[in-house]
């Protein structure tokens, strides 16, 4: 948001954004947030515990502290702020810092305007999903990051008029965390998670009411009453996203519902974080964020008709002629 700010400040914030992201990711990967979990420590102690150079670490933490991430309580002694506590672990924010400051950061640095393959593929020689399959430790980090905010996403699902006894198919549901949260709130529901075999999941957390089905959403989707796509379609270009929707449409009955948990990008110059996420999708996956008009067009191509647009939730039903 630039209204009321000096033009130079607007440009400067954009210029320094890349290095801020990299520094945050580096500090998280060093384990600094966890090292400070028990209380403030001198930077010399942190350097010994994490294998970093003390002077370099001091400069990195000082820069982050100026943005409210960590605080320098006295010269050379750092502690947590509410913002840095999010990075200790277990919430997904540490994983996002690792991704944004690492492999996604390198992909963003390779963005070109030629409309060809994503920068990630140009750099690594393979697509992101194949790369994750070959790097299981990164796949696990990615899945934990995607689980961040599951309570918020589940809150959005409450806008749907649940009957209470539906079978819910979470298409591309990763480790199943979204369905776990939903079924805890609605004990009458039954869940099915569809995702690739290499997806890391917690069988104990899934429980008896959730079945994990291995497979590709480009090929086959289990039958259900409600299909959920939680931040899946933005990973794909229009043609691929329409293929996913058509696969679901083949399994859906006439009274099934589709719930899409994805951003509805604001048009024009309105400030909207999803516009920057859209550029990240371009760099890493050749995916995209979409406006309401673009969502309507995509749903129609996939055999669905939108019923209503909630905040970050699109409700649709099979089109009569789908």
Q: Residues of each region from the PLM?
A:
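C-terminal alpha-helical "lid/dimerization" subdomain adjacent to the S-adenosyl-L-methionine
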Residues: 261-302, 307
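Conserved adenosyl
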Residues: 91-270, 306, 311-313
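Residue-level recognition of alpha-helix initiation/capping sites
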Residues: 27, 55-56, 173, 239, ...
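Conserved Class I S-adenosyl-L-methionine-dependent methyltransferase catalytic core
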Residues: 2, 7-42, 48-49, 54-166
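C-terminal lobe and adjacent flexible extensions of AdoMet/dcAdoMet transferase-like proteins
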Residues: 314-322
């Amino acid at each position: 948001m630039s209204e009321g700010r000096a033009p130079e400040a607007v440009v400067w914030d954009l210029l320094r954004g890349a290095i801020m992201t990299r520094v945050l990711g580096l500090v998280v990967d060093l384990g600094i947030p966890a090292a400070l979990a028990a209380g403030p420590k001198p930077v010399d102690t942190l350097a010994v515990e994490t294998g970093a150079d003390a002077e370099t670490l001091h400069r990195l933490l000082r820069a982050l502290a100026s943005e409210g991430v960590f605080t320098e309580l006295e010269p050379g002694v750092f502690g947590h702020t509410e913002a840095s506590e999010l990075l200790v672990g277990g919430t997904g924010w540490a994983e996002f810092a690792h991704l944004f400051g690492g492999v996604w950061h390198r992909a963003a640095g390779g963005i070109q305007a030629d409309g060809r393959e994503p920068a990630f593929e140009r750099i690594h020689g393979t697509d992101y999903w194949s790369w994750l399959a070959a790097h299981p430790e990164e796949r696990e980090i990615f899945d934990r990051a995607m689980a961040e905010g599951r309570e918020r996403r589940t809150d959005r699902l409450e806008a749907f008029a649940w009957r209470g006894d539906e079978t819910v198919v979470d298409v591309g549901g990763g480790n199943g965390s979204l369905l776990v949260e939903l079924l805890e709130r609605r004990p009458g529901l039954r869940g099915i998670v569809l995702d690739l075999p290499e997806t890391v999941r917690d069988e104990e957390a899934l429980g008896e009411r959730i079945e994990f089905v291995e497979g590709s959403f480009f090929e086959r989707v289990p039958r259900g009453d409600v299909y959920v796509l939680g931040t899946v379609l933005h990973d794909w270009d229009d043609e691929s996203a329409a293929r996913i929707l058509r696969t679901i449409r083949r399994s859906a009955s006439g009274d099934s519902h589709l719930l899409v948990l994805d951003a509805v990008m604001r048009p024009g110059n309105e400030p909207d974080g999803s516009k920057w996420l859209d550029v990240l999708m371009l760099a890493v996956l050749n995916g995209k964020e979409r406006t309401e008009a673009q969502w309507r067009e995509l749903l129609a191509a996939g055999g669905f008709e939108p019923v209503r647009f909630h905040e970050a939730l699109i409700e649709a039903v099979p089109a009569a002629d789908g």
